[in-house]
Amino acid sequence: MASVAELKEKHAAATASVNSLRERLRQRRQMLLDTDVERYSRTQGRTPVSFNPTDLVCCRTLQGHSGKVYSLDWTPEKNWIVSASQDGRLIVWNALTSQKTHAIKLHCPWVMTCAFAPNGQSVACGGLDSACSIFNLNSQADRDGNIPVSRILTGHKGYVSSCQYVPDQETRLITSSGDQTCVLWDVTTGQRISIFGGEFPSGHTADVLSLSINSSISNMFVSGSCDATVRLWDIRIASRAVRTYHGHEGDINSVKFFPDGQRFGTGSDDGTCRLFDVRTGHQLQVYSREPDRNDNELPTVTSIAFSISGRLLFAGYSNGDCYVWDTLLAEVVLNLGNLQNSHEGRISCLGLSSDGSALCTGSWDKNLKIWAFSGHRKIV
């Protein structure tokens, strides 16, 4: 029987072999991919998106949380935002008036994620309690203004890092977790429909931090993980991942489908955002900033979102910056962190309204901010 030392040696050798093969595969793919988005766009005479510092302004600051803001989501149809904070509350905001319509005290204060149902009548949240709680906003509130939990989805063996409703389906929700899995739930019954990963060899090998459902093909979703990979899943086939995407060198904190559903973007601890082709698996572009003057390490990318056309990529960073990238030319056209009334802490979350008229950012400074183009122009 092999000793522990021998097993460790074999494991180290196998790991080195896998890493070597992965690097050879990356180099081979790079040889076959004769260009990237940025170089091709320049050959076609594309010019950068033009921005002035006064074009995008902070028109609202939403104050009400007493702890770090961790997550936010826009309702699909109306001008409402839900936010989750370290203070153990969910707050539902009217984005037009800055008024709070609900301030829900959670039974577990360690919340990490929140999401609106497609009809805007319910919100979901999850965190370190390993559960996903559903609240019906039409429920009768108690004397303190709190509303009861309508459903608790239990089954994960680790923290719930992200949740998202399947588009146009109020009864279907997908969660990602520190137990290395994603789960499709029936919200009505509270039952798990499918588990993605776990004992299956094609699943993630570390905590799953983020997910994004394809709005064009709602059967498909991607998940980003601490194993530095993204996996594509088909909710009809839970037994295996459709494809695995490599390229990052750190935890993947955020994934988001491109508006056309044919590509997706990522944001990582390695300080870069990347754009991948869903079908081919090719990495199309890397969006990387220069290191800070006093620090050789790049700030972490915490959250990303695309404009409705896909021409702009919004990326929040751990140092409080929020870059607006031109996705075609891989250039930063604006940094919201340099504008008046910007955040004073880490950007933890961000999201674009469904009509593309406004961007909302959340921060560890306890505030949310709504950004819009001056002159009421939509974000391109």
From Swiss-Prot:
The keyword Cell membrane applies. GO terms for biological process: defense response to fungus; endoplasmic reticulum unfolded protein response; fruit development; G protein-coupled receptor signaling pathway; jasmonic acid mediated signaling pathway; lateral root development; plant organ morphogenesis; reactive oxygen species metabolic process. WD repeats lie at residues 64-103, 106-145, 155-195, 203-243, 247-286, 296-335, 342-380. Keywords: Cell membrane, Membrane, Repeat, Transducer, WD repeat. PANTHER family: GUANINE NUCLEOTIDE-BINDING PROTEIN BETA G PROTEIN BETA. G proteins are composed of 3 units, alpha, beta and gamma. Interacts with the gamma subunits RGG1 and RGG2. GO terms for cellular component: Cul4-RING E3 ubiquitin ligase complex; endoplasmic reticulum; heterotrimeric G-protein complex. This is Guanine nucleotide-binding protein subunit beta. The gene is RGBB. The lineage of its organism: Eukaryota, Viridiplantae, Streptophyta, Embryophyta, Tracheophyta. It is found in: Cell membrane. Guanine nucleotide-binding proteins (G proteins) are involved as modulators or transducers in various transmembrane signaling systems. The beta and gamma chains are required for the GTPase activity, for replacement of GDP by GTP, and for G protein-effector interaction. SUPFAM superfamilies: WD40 repeat-like. Pfam families: WD40_Gbeta. Belongs to the WD repeat G protein beta family. The keyword Endoplasmic reticulum does not apply. Its main location: membrane. SMART domains: WD40.
